[in-house]
Structure formats: C-alpha cells, structure tokens
C-alpha cells in the first residue's frame, strides 16, 4: 500500500465528488426529454431498475479496483493483475478515454460560462426567438471567443486540482455541489409555480404506460438502459481514482447507492425545472444543446425576472459541467503522478498545456473545420469525439472492468467481494455472482452493438 496516498478528509467529500463526476450535462439535456417521451414516471421506474442492476455493480467494481490497488487507472491493473497477463492494457484505454472526454467537455463547459455572462449582461433582453437562436450560432462561428472560454474552463479546473485533494478538489467541489442543489431547488420552485405548469408536472411525473407502449417497449428499455449506463461515467476509470482515496471503513455498495441516489435526484429535479416551464410557455422541450442554449433562454426571456433565473440556471449548468471536469482532471493529473512519479504541480502544468491543445479540434470543428463531417453530413469533430468515448470506450471499458473482477484469469470474484465488502454498511449480494459473470457482460455488449445500430443503421 502507498503510504503517501492522499485521502479524502470525509466520507461526504468522497460521495459528493463521485456524484459530481457522475452528474453531467446528460442529466439535464437528455434525461428530462426521454422521461417525458417514454411515459414519465413509468420510464423512471424502468430506469431505476437498470441503474441498480447495470450501473451500480460496475461502479462498485471500479471503486474496488481503485481502493485495492491504491492507484489511478494508469497503474491499478498493473498492481492487481495475475503475473504474465495483459489486463494493464485496459489502463491505457482508460487514460485515453479521460483525455478524449475532456477534448470536447471543456468546450461545452466554456459555453456554459459564456452564457452565464450573456445572461448577467442582459444580452437576450428584447430578442425574438430566432435572434436568441442566432446568439448560439454566432458563438459557434467565433473560434477566438470559444477558445477563450475553453481556456478559462481548463484553467479553473486545473487550478482547483493544483491546490491538492483535500484543500482543492474536495473543499471546492463540496461548496460547488451544495450551491448546485440550492440553485436547482430554487429553479424547481420557480418552474412548478409558473401559471400553466401543472400540465407539464402531470406529463413528467404521472406514469403513462400508454405512451410507453406507443413508443415501443424495446425502445423504452434500451433508452432506460443507455441512460442508466451513461449517466455514471463508467468504464474509463474516472470513478476508480476516488476509490483509491478512501479508507476501508465503509463497504462500497452503500457508498455507491448514495452516489446513484444523488445523480438520480439531480436528473429528476432538472426535469421539474425544464418540463413544467416548457409547458407553461407552450414550447416543445426537445433535448441536447438546442434545449439549453435556445429553448430555455427564450423561456427566461418571457419570464418575470427572467434574467436572474437565466443566470442562475447557467450557473447551475456550469457547476454540473465543472464538477465532472474537476473529477476527470484529478484522474488525468494522477496518471502522470502514478506513471512518472511527478509532483502534483508539474503534472498540472503539463496537462494544462496538453488539454488546451487537444481541445482545439473540437472548437475549430464548429467553424474553420466545419466542412469536415466525420460521421456523415452535419456531424462535427465533437460528434466524433463523443462517439469514440460514449459508443466505444465507456461500454468496452466497463466490460473489461467487469471481466477483470469476475474472471479467474483476472483479479477474480473472491478478491473483488472481499474489497467491496470491507468496512461497515451494505454488502454486495454474493448471490449475484452468476448474473455478474454471465448475464451483465451480455447486457453491456447489447448496449455496445445497439449504439452502433442506432448511429449507422436506424
């Protein structure tokens, strides 16, 4: 065991930071939309089922590998793999996944910060709906402006990490996550008290099995599976690092349950902000960047004190993006520290330069390189980077973590259970061995294959 390993100062720090890593933009711009589309609370029940049987076991395995090895993904497999095996190659894929994720996430984080400023300075006041959409298009067309905000995002993230695990990452993420919840609750109260919001609340929360059947049960199940899987940032070792920073006082199943509960709470509350507000103003919610950067600014424009609520919303979105960015930057820094024995400050300086350079193709893909459509007409560099991470590295990485923890040729089931169950709290059900070894890998392979099918053949 590494005696110099940094530690979280509290259990709350570990739970909030891990939840911060999981809570990302998909909680806001995808979850409310698919929940409304696929039957409201009926869909949420299916989603929660898959969160428990699909997302949680893999997260527990990632934490176990991190805690047992006391290393980041770069070295954890080296420490735990049986001699002569090649499991450590998974670590290099995980490292690539963290860098690739940040190659486009930093740009989107920059958009959020830019929109906080736009809201505070009243840039949207008096604009028509088309003009509001034009603000976003205009931003995408300016490589210099987007680069500046991307660099600000990178510098904020690495500055927090440079202060150290307890004084930086833990202390600042705790404050940020607390503010995120307070702002989210305030936005919720405002949204559900808008005139005409009741219809939206009913659409979002009342189970509608007819809507579910209409959409097709297979499609609903796959959407729930995908959301449960992708919401937790699994498969690239992003969670594993936080396992290496905690003691063996608590079992990992109970901690994972708390993290998943926080992630789901944010997703559900985000829906209570968005869906009732869209219904109140008779606007189709939609999903993705269009929802956040065009639909919602139009709603804030029509709302009393809309400038204030709009600014609060984009501060909330900035915190959601930055909590993930800081968590992944902590991973990226720890790779250099584990592999080359660097000091934290040196790892920070090296990676600031690396991430800024690596983030440029995403920025330029919206303007100077917009003719480059890697995944077919209308696609961008960002779509390609997202596809590599979401459709390939996350499912395949999760599959490798799973096989490593269940196969006798890897770390093995007994070692995994011993680690996961160390400490007080909820234990991992040993009866799930057959399910985890034989059925769960097939579910992940199904998600992987269906991702390709939807992308290229649907």
Regions found by a protein language model. Give the residues of each.
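Select transmembrane alpha-helical segments in multipass membrane proteins
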Residues: 7-18, 43-46, 85-99, 147-153, ...
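Extracellular loop-to-transmembrane helix junctions
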Residues: 6, 35-61, 145-146, 394-398
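Loop-to-transmembrane helix boundary motifs in multi-pass membrane proteins
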Residues: 7, 13-15, 21, 143, ...
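Transmembrane helix-boundary motif of multi-pass solute transporters/channels
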Residues: 12-50, 237-243, 254-257, 261-262, ...
